[in-house]
Amino acid sequence: MKPIYGEWYSYLETHYRYLKCITKILTSHTRTPSTSSLNEFFVNRLHLDSEWMRDRLTNDAGERDLAKRHLQNAWFNECALRYPLGSENLLERMRFAPWKIVQFYYTIYSGISTMLRFVNSKKIRSHNTALNLFVSEIVSDKRIRNRLFPAPLCFVLKGEQLLPDPNSISISRLARSYCSELVTCLVSTRNHLNLKGQAGLVHYFRWLREWANYSAGYIFANLYGDVVRQRLDDGLLLISNSFMLAIEISAASFLGLEDLLEIYRNFRKMTVARLQFEPSFLDERMSLLEKKRVPTA
């Protein structure tokens, strides 16, 4: 078998399967597997535990100005990920599919950095440190993990056990049926990245980015058809949207909703004026947060 075809099969047997699994669990929360219906569902159910937030702020006031900058970076990366907007632009958007994976990762990473900066003023010197802190101190905390992060983003692998136990939280039978595949994904991630502690999906997203950067990302242009491109596009957009909505809910809790909306208005003004880009997907999320009046500090 030629090396390029080995890479072709390798992708289909790993990242294609894992993204399908993650996306299936996410979309199982609603009857209509669309971003809009997921946003409505999550904004009604996700929240940041106020006691957890007070405890963290008592220990460390964080760096709010830096958190705001990271949040705007996350939005900028998400705009790049979604450009050009619309299902009719799928082929154009995914022409350089591996670069979209990189933009997806930096959307997630900037979102992680945002939340860490709300509760941690110490210097974070590497991506490894940030990902490990996020998983061990935020996602693994029983008080918030499935309150703020929807399945499967709430799951971590500790040893060989998936936490929280899928049977202990409110998810569909379809979602539970994909949890064994999720365990396989996280075990493979832990082995690939040589992780010593708990593994979360944010670690997997780093592995996915490394595949795009260092393996054979160029094979998308040569070998994969519309179905594979569509699956990748759907996965990246749905996952980043759900993750960032959780980060925005946490930002509304730490900053206050009006402060968050003001930051977004300034960001939007710059994006439209300088980039001629209308971030309609962000408008939708901000409108929902404002409409539902997400509880704040």
Model region roles, listed by residue range:
Residues 1-297:
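Terminal alpha-helical segments
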